[in-house]
């Protein structure tokens, strides 16, 4: 049985915890293992994974604190959460065979209790009626079903923008002799080695590295590198972020740069600070480092990751964040031996780096070999992430008065920085996997969403475990689009113009991307683009999702103004079974953000991820796709009569 977690074993494991999809339309659910405090936890049983003996049987469903396999063996009793009413209040129903939706129930409204949980379906006395059913309050193998066991079935997690694990922040500053560095342009800068430091403390008022909390033997280190400004105290503009990181168990440092510094010279100053930080904290500072850079600093931290490896600096740089970065000095290809998890954050109303080129889109496109993510934040600007800079980029000529009025608040900017950066560093420096969904675009921290009623964040994401169907790289000709990266034929039906494959910016002057892609337009709901999956590549059952990057094309008359685009992604198997998933039920293909200066509006791609479970869960009167034998992947333009989009990175992925 596909629900048996261990070959030959008797543990029936099935994904149960889920979210309802937008609009409550089929495929109805998106299975997940992470919910924020305040979210609704739904649960369903996929008839495909039910033993025939389970169908049409009464069952009680429990949410219980997670137990390991050994703990379940020692004690298989079930204790439904007290907050849900205990065992007397378990939900009960008759399992259905005809559709996943028929087994869909709200398990926990407004989940309020942070923790790790398992979901257990108890078939009790194996009754076919609720009247005759008696639950036994035990997890009995092989009859009962569990979502959990080896790992938690799901987690309820706090908001990373406000969550803290320590009560106090220690702080001090240091200044050491200046260092002279040479910039990428050949200029020299003499830079005071000055920094602000925050760390977790056990008491208020701690001002020495020796006062670091005794709760842990050592702590990861995060260093922030600011960008260019005439202010000589720019490094102080991230104190709010340092405080939050310290309260989450990091030694957090923001370092000074001189006005006018460029890229590599900023990386050299970072190089000079790291030994000082580790000397101050000794064994309390773990060689487990995250680096964040803003603007020119955002390019500098990518340079630093490369130099650390090439020159043997000796630091374990394990996470890199570029906030509204430049891409103008060394034009990095972040990857290879120095590839590390990477996050880019950038706003649609950046008033300093608002151009089509020289932005984080380019750094993201040229990063490879790591888990990478980019958050494109509608209405965020450049300078409000730094409290010293304030609204400085309002006056650089790239933001109109209407743009300035539309920019989200300084508080929203700070919550974004605290939420996304803390979650990223907690994931990659502390191994806390519960934050992954943020960077796949599955959820936004609640305080971030609540900080502005129109908050929109669109995510690009790429995993290291992928099977690429097409990335559109290589030699481009009029017919090169007809052959995919995976080696299959590509065809179209009904499109009014032949699709064009080329470097995106050569096809669309509004594209911020430095990568190849496909541009296409449709004018009928019967139009399609079809990818043949060659033999030997058709088993995608080991992946979690199918994904692609997509953007509406700026200024295209085919895209309805101020409307999201929509389409269906269809998989077909060797037996001719097909299922089409409507994108708008899982994600959004947004209309390009229109800012006051038309030349700065961007055809910015986001990543659409469709769980492969959506293609094989049981839905009434809809084909189930055999994921071990997928022969065709099709874009079907059946949802909107017209449209023009650019696509890239078609992948089966985790």
Task: Indicate where each model-derived feature is located.
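Extended, solvent-exposed regions of the mature portions of secreted/cell-surface glycoproteins
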Residues: 2-159
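Extracellular ligand-binding interfaces
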Residues: 69-80, 522-622, 629, 637-654
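Short conserved active-site loop signatures built around small residues
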Residues: 91-92, 141-217
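Gly/Ser-rich "nucleophile elbow"/oxyanion-hole loop immediately N-terminal to the catalytic nucleophile
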Residues: 204-218, 264-295, 311
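Short substrate-entry loop that stabilizes the transition state in hydrolases
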Residues: 204-207, 214-219, 224-262, 351-354
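Primarily recognizes the serine-hydrolase "nucleophile elbow" in alpha/beta-hydrolase
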Residues: 278-336
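Active-site-adjacent alpha-helix of alpha/beta-hydrolase-fold enzymes
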Residues: 337-411
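Alpha/beta-hydrolase-fold serine-hydrolase catalytic core, especially in secreted/extracellular enzymes
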Residues: 379-381, 388-531, 541-547
């Amino acid at each position: 049985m596909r629900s048996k977690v261990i070959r030959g074993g008797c543990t029936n494991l099935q994904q149960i915890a889920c979210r309802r999809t937008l609009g409550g339309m089929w495929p109805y659910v998106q299975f997940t293992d992470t919910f924020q405090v305040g979210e609704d936890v739904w649960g369903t049983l996929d008839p495909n994974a039910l033993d025939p003996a389970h169908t049409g049987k009464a069952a009680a469903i429990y949410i219980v604190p997670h137990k390991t396999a050994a703990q379940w063996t020692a004690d298989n009793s079930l204790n439904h959460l007290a907050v849900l009413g205990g065992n007397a209040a378990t939900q009960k129903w008759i399992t259905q065979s005809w559709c996943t939706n028929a087994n869909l129930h709200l398990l926990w409204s407004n989940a309020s209790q942070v923790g790790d949980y398992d979901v257990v379906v108890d078939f009790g006395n194996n009754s076919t009626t609720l009247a005759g059913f008696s639950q036994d309050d035990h997890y009995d193998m092989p009859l009962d079903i569990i979502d959990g066991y080896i790992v938690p079935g799901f987690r309820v997690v706090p908001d990373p923008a406000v969550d803290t694990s320590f009560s106090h922040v220690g702080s001090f500053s240091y200044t050491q002799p200046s260092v002279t560095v040479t910039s990428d342009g050949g200029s020299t800068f003499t830079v005071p080695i000055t920094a602000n430091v925050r760390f977790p403390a056990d008491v208020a008022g701690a001002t020495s590295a020796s006062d670091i909390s005794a709760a842990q033997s050592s702590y990861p280190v995060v260093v922030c590198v600011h960008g260019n400004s005439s202010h000589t105290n720019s490094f102080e503009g991230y104190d709010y972020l340092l405080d939050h990181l310290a309260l989450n168990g990091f030694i957090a440092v923001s370092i000074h740069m001189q006005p006018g510094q460029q890229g590599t010279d900023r990386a050299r100053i970072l190089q000079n600070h790291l030994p000082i930080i580790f000397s101050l904290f000794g064994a309390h500072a773990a060689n487990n480092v995250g680096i964040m850079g803003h603007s020119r600093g955002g390019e500098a931290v990518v340079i630093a990751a490369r130099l650390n490896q090439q020159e043997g600096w000796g630091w374990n740089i394990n996470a890199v964040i570029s906030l509204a970065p430049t891409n103008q000095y060394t034009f990095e290809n972040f990857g290879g031996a120095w590839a590390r998890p990477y996050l880019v954050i950038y706003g649609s109303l950046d008033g300093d780096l608002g151009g089509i080129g020289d932005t984080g889109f380019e750094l993201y496109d040229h990063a490879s070999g790591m888990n990478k993510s980019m958050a494109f934040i509608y209405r965020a600007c450049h300078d409000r992430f730094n409290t010293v800079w304030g609204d400085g980029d309002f006056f650089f000529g790239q933001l109109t008065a209407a743009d300035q009025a539309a920019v989200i608040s300084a508080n929203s900017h700070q919550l974004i920085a605290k939420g996304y950066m803390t979650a990223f560093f907690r994931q990659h420096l502390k191994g806390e996997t519960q934050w992954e969904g943020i960077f796949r675009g599955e959820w936004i921290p609640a305080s971030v969403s609540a900080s502005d009623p129109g908050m929109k964040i669109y995510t690009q994401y790429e995993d290291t475990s992928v099977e690429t169907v097409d990335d559109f790289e290589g030699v481009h000709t009029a017919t090169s689009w007809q052959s995919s990266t995976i080696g299959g034929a590509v065809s179209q039906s009904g499109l009014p113009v032949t699709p064009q494959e080329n470097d995106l910016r050569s096809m669309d002057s509004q594209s911020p991307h430095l990568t190849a892609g496909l541009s296409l337009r449709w004018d009928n709901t019967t139009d399609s683009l079809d990818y043949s999956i060659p033999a030997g590549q058709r088993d995608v059952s080991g992946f979690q999702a199918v994904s692609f990057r997509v953007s509406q094309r700026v200024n295209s008359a085919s895209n309805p103004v101020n409307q999201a685009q929509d389409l269906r992604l269809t998989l077909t198997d060797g037996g001719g079974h097909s299922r089409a998933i409507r994108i708008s039920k899982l994600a959004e293909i947004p209309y390009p953000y229109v800012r006051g200066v038309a030349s700065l509006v961007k055809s910015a791609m986001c990543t659409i991820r469709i769980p492969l479970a959506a293609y094989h869960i049981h839905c009434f009167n809809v084909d189930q796709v055999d994921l071990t034998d997928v022969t065709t992947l099709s874009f079907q333009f059946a949802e909107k009569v017209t449209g023009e989009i650019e696509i890239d990175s078609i992948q089966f992925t985790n």
